[in-house]
Structure formats: structure tokens, C-alpha cells
A protein has these predicted regions:
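Short, polar loop/linker segments at the starts of domains and inter-domain junctions
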Residues: 72-91, 208-214, 270-289
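Intrinsic disorder/low-complexity segments
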Residues: 1-50
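GGW-centered surface loops in extracellular recognition modules
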Residues: 51-66, 162-165
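Active-site microenvironments of metalloenzymes and redox enzymes
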Residues: 69-74, 87-188, 196, 233-241, ...
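Disulfide-stabilized, aromatic/cysteine-rich ligand-recognition loop
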Residues: 47-50, 215-217, 252-303
Length: 303
């Protein structure tokens, strides 16, 4: 009698009573859910574009901020943060960090711009900067890099079509700070986590700190919360949001104060919120002002 080789028969697993066996159909369903889960995780960052940086001749990298719309202001914030309104912002470039003393001194040598800072250090943010000084530095940096300056230093008017450096508009600043978020801070609304991204009154030990030590926001920008408050190009008006343009707003036509954003090493967690606004005279006429807590960062139009 001829022997045949035994070949075991493989059959699909089926559910047997309460033993918990799983059928082929159920395996396929589970596999589908797993695949869907991976796709969902992959898409969680769809609204947070990959960080695209641009090197500059002056040494501070810039981040390409994508065009888009966002909800500006805060429903639960101070009166000058209301009403919340939808704003469209064109793409632009923003310094990855606050302006450092090293770069200020590099460019300032040829422009008679001495370092005004109270706390000294190459990697520290420059501070004790008036608005006119910040605008003048933007022009100096533009010339240093062969770009067209934006500011008329006699009138403080800004040429937004020039390809040089300028201060961000208030809308650009908040849009970049939020980095796609709609919460109190770029990372959420839990102020207890602010120390992960910011130097503020609770952790700064009464001084500024080297830029870029804390976590960046989703768009790769450092110290948008805390360290030093940052000048914006706009004139401050506590009621401006009631009449603000909905596309690339550039602030009121005139006023006695300019906008500061972001809070500082002296600020509370509340003052470091993304929507928090502060108006200050551009030349530091207020004797009570914390001057060593004010700096800036530059932006450029995206070409």
C-alpha cells in the first residue's frame, strides 16, 4: 500500500463559544481599525506644517510662516482682546529667536548702535530697546544683508513692499505665536506647563536667559512666550479689534503707544498668553516701565 505524506489541513480560526477565538473576518476588521489609527495619528499634524527655516547673513535663522487664517483675540481675556475675529495673514518670514546681543553688536558696529542691554551676554536677548531703536536696527540689518530698508526713520512709516526687515504686525505676531492653536498658549491652556516653553516670573530668577533654551512652538519659534516682551509694528488701540481689517491688518493709523507682545521674565503667566496685548510709548516715557524686559524679533516678506 502506497503511503502518502501527511499534510495538515489549515483552517480559519473561528469563534468557539466563550473561549474567545477570533474569526478571520474579525481579524480583518481589527486590522482595519489599526490602519485607521495610524492614519489619524499621521494627520494630527496636518495643520502644523513642517518647519522650514531660512539662513541669513546676520546669523539668525528665520522660519517660513505659512499663509492662513486664525481667530485673533480671546473670548475670556481682557477687554482689549475682544471681540475675537477671523484674520487672514499672508506668508512671511520670522526670526526663529528673539534678537540676540551678538547679532545686535555685529550689525550695530557700523551703524552707531551700542548694545543697550542691562543683562550682558552674546546669547541673551537684547533689551532696553525703544521702538525707534528696534526700527532703526531693522534698517541696519537690511543694509547689512543688501536688502531694501522698510522704515523711514524720520516719520516711522513702514514700507511693507520692501524686502528688508521690519517689526511684525500685531496680527502676524499672534498668528505665529499660536502656530495653529486656539488656546491660551501655543501648547494649550494649562498655565502650569508654561515653564516648559517660557521664562517668566515663576522661573526666570529675575533675569533674562539665552534664547532658544525652552521648547519651540509647533512652527519652530522659540521664546514667543516670556523672556523679553517683543515690540510689534502696530500702534496700540484698546478698541482696535472692533474695526480691524480682516486681511493683513496693520493697526491704527496713529496713536501714542506701540504694541508689546509675549510677556517677559518679569511677567505673570497671564501676561504671557498668546492673545495678551500691551501698549507702551515707543520712547520709554513711563518711568515705571520694566525696560530690561523689552526686546524684539524681525520679520520679512516672503518673496
Amino acid at each position: 500500500m502506497k503511503r502518502t505524506q501527511y499534510k495538515p489541513r489549515i483552517t480559519p480560526i473561528t469563534r468557539i463559544g466563550k473561549a474567545g477565538f477570533i474569526s478571520i473576518r474579525e481579524i480583518r476588521v481589527i486590522r482595519g481599525f489599526i490602519l485607521l489609527g495610524f492614519l489619524v495619528l499621521a494627520c494630527l499634524g496636518c495643520n502644523s506644517p513642517a518647519v522650514n527655516t531660512v539662513a541669513t547673513k546676520s546669523g539668525i535663522d528665520m522660519v517660513v510662516i505659512p499663509a492662513g487664517s486664525f481667530e485673533m483675540g480671546s473670548k475670556s481675556g481682557r477687554p482689549d482682546e475682544k471681540p475675537v475675529h477671523t484674520v487672514w495673514v499672508d506668508a512671511f518670514l520670522m526670526d526663529k529667536t528673539e534678537m540676540t546681543q551678538a547679532v545686535w553688536e555685529l550689525i550695530g558696529k557700523a551703524e552707531a548702535l551700542p548694545n543697550p542691554s542691562h543683562f550682558k551676554g552674546a546669547a541673551l536677548p537684547v533689551e532696553q530697546v525703544t521702538w525707534p531703536q528696534a526700527a532703526r536696527f531693522c534698517n541696519a540689518r537690511s543694509r547689512f544683508e543688501g536688502l531694501k530698508p522698510c522704515y523711514n526713520e524720520d516719520t516711522a512709516e513702514c514700507d511693507f513692499e520692501a524686502d528688508g526687515y521690519r517689526l511684525p504686525t500685531e496680527a502676524e505676531w499672534e498668528y505665529a505665536c499660536r502656530a495653529g492653536s486656539a488656546t491660551d498658549y501655543s501648547f494649550g491652556s494649562d498655565g502650569r506647563k508654561l515653564g516648559d516653553v517660557a521664562w517668566f516670573v515663576d522661573n526666570a530668577a529675575k533675569k533674562t536667559h539665552p534664547v532658544g533654551q525652552k521648547k519651540a512652538n509647533a512652527w519652530g519659534l522659540f521664546d514667543m512666550h516670556g523672556n523679553v516682551a517683543e515690540w510689534c509694528n502696530d500702534v496700540y488701540d484698546k478698541e482696535y479689534y472692533q474695526t480691524s481689517a480682516d486681511k493683513n491688518p496693520r493697526g491704527p493709523a496713529d496713536g501714542k503707544e506701540n504694541v508689546l507682545r509675549g510677556g517677559s521674565w518679569k511677567s505673570s503667566a497671564d501676561a504671557a498668553r498668546s492673545a495678551y496685548r500691551l501698549g507702551e510709548t515707543p520712547g520709554f516715557s513711563d518711568a515705571c516701565l520694566a525696560r530690561d524686559a523689552i526686546g524684539f524679533r524681525c520679520v520679512r516678506k516672503k518673496i
